[in-house]
């Protein structure tokens, strides 16, 4: 059970718990009174904002599109209650201009309050990235009722594996770009303690990266079970690779079909996956496991970061809302060579990656296809969108195999 300091963390606004974790347990707690979220503190600087404004002229990311000198001047001296600044939010986007044809987000949050204190920049970035969702006027819905899914069984001549993942953050502890070693270890302690309560087909064990051999880590990475080593410039520039591999690890059930990553880009990534095309079964396990993990977290006096405007709070604005990415590894040797392929994906609100994850190339015409949106639609809606979209892609591939023409579908209606 969480101690009195831990429970105060999420129970009393305006109080901040600084947990000093040692040997995997809470060693001491100090209550630090902070100002309300919107009354962010100010800090002094030696030079005017105009002298500090970053050179974004060659950048192609959402942050650069919305960070004007005026916005920078209004926000650059603010800090969240934990001391997180605007410059820390945007550093990864400043250091990584982006690809001419691939627009990245270009910013991260350091804590839950980041999205309020720097809302003048985050809100328009969120609106652009999430297909017009306006966090100032809209509310996000959550739906984890897997029984609502229609169909969900793919032709396994094309679909090699199915997977659904999300992220969850522990309220009261800084997010990975900003967390201290003690906070990161506290995240690990809280999560692993909760996961020990999983039963039945969800029961499993936790494996610390620091206790694995290089060969064991690489095998898990190659099998698509474990996150890659922190070599991505987006990850390192944001500060998420500090102290690697301290307090990082993977928990999985005995069948390796339900997994939780700890302390990579987010506090946790919850994953349901299996070989083949049974997306409905994968999503059912995902919903059941995620609900049970949240119950066990709450039972111990903690809770996930969430609000009705943004849904579940995660490090990258692209993952707000559901945090959900439902995807398949799919063979599309003919469609992938068709010039209409990118437009088809765009209209279906799908995105493609290589099978090694973000920023990787496809191998053998096998792609990772998943939903583009996270916020403004429920989990059920997004998984159904992927099911319908992947079936459309399979139909296109079959038509091309028979020498028939394919069509570009009309854009999906934008319903938030």
Curated annotation (Swiss-Prot):
This is Creatine kinase U-type, mitochondrial. One of its GO terms (molecular function) is ATP binding. The keyword Transit peptide applies. The lineage of its organism: Eukaryota, Metazoa, Chordata, Craniata, Vertebrata. Residues 40-64 are annotated as: Cardiolipin-binding. Residues 1-39 form a transit peptide. It comes from Bos taurus. Exists as an octamer composed of four MTCK homodimers. Its main location: mitochondrion. One of its GO terms (cellular component) is mitochondrial inner membrane. InterPro entries: ATP-guanido_PTrfase, ATP-guanido_PTrfase_AS, ATP-guanido_PTrfase_cat, ATP-guanido_PTrfase_N, ATP-guanido_PTrfase_N_sf, Gln_synth/guanido_kin_cat_dom.
